Amino acid sequence: MRLLLQKTTFLLALALGSSAFAADKAPPPPSGDIWEHRLTDFSDSDYRFAVEQLFQDFERTTGHKLVPGAKKKVGLKIYADSGPGLATPFGLVRALIAALEKRGFEHQNIFLVGLNPLRLRLTGFLPSLATGVVPFPGHPVYVLESGKFYDPAWFYDSPLPSRFDPVTNDRAVEAAAGGKSTTTTEEDRKSFLATPLFLDADFWINLPVYTDHPVLGINGALVNATLWNASNTFRFFKSPATAPAAVAEMAAIPELREGWALNITSLQLYQFIGGPYFNSLYTVSEPHLLMSTDPVILDALMVGKLNEARKKTGFEPITEDDSRMLDYAAQLGVGSSDAKHIHWIHVDGATP
């Protein structure tokens, strides 16, 4: 299977029988629906009520029940890659766990997926080395950079230079190469996909947190599901010409999209400039929880919100050229890049 876009090539190498997905089963077309629920104080109970109301309305509106299937597992793709201060809220994660357990998922079959062990520990998703406190006892946390959750049959191929980390500026060669200090040219071309989300789970939910991004324009739903969800992807952050294409092509993988049920983001805190590094001086908080099956239109909405905040503080806006990955993703059928096409479903009657 191969997609070509801006000289970037997607290769999904499948060993015979390695996929649990039907090859002829296409993901549903994007709807443009965004569900919204107002929050009051960002407490656990606040999130729990909002998530349950959103789930009930989604199930009623679409006819799709968020219940266990044949695999009896569900994955939550968390975001921790801006470091302490800007990560998927714990209250939201606890609320989702409660809602999914209510629908029949067993405690141990709800797992979390994150990328970098240091940032997962600094943001509290992994136990503190000092206290050993586990934030989500009984729920596995899969750390992708451990190298344990990739399958050599599933990779994205691109002839870009080797990797670097846009947040810490440390080379991640050893971790991504299975402990080796050097890598071959062939290995450097490959970004291995995180298989637990689309091979082990009935479906998975994407939980992005929003920042701007100097190369991609917007760091949100699409990026959390792609470049923060595979090995050896930091290399793409070097090039504005190739990174948008890589995000769009990875997001268009049918097997990944088939189980990609929802994107849910809290506007408890988002950052409008200086990202993906966390900087509290450039953050905004709004009392809204947003949910959509369409990651592209959610990102398009947030580009507008980031630009509103930039305008108020005297910064230049994110342009269409800056965020062209949204157009690329729309061309590949991942979603709609035009925020004018949003169909709002205000579960509690509020308007963001």
Indicate residue ranges for each PLM-predicted region.
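N-terminal and secondary-structure boundary signal
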Residues: 22-352
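Positively charged n-region of N-terminal signal peptides that target proteins for export
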Residues: 1-7
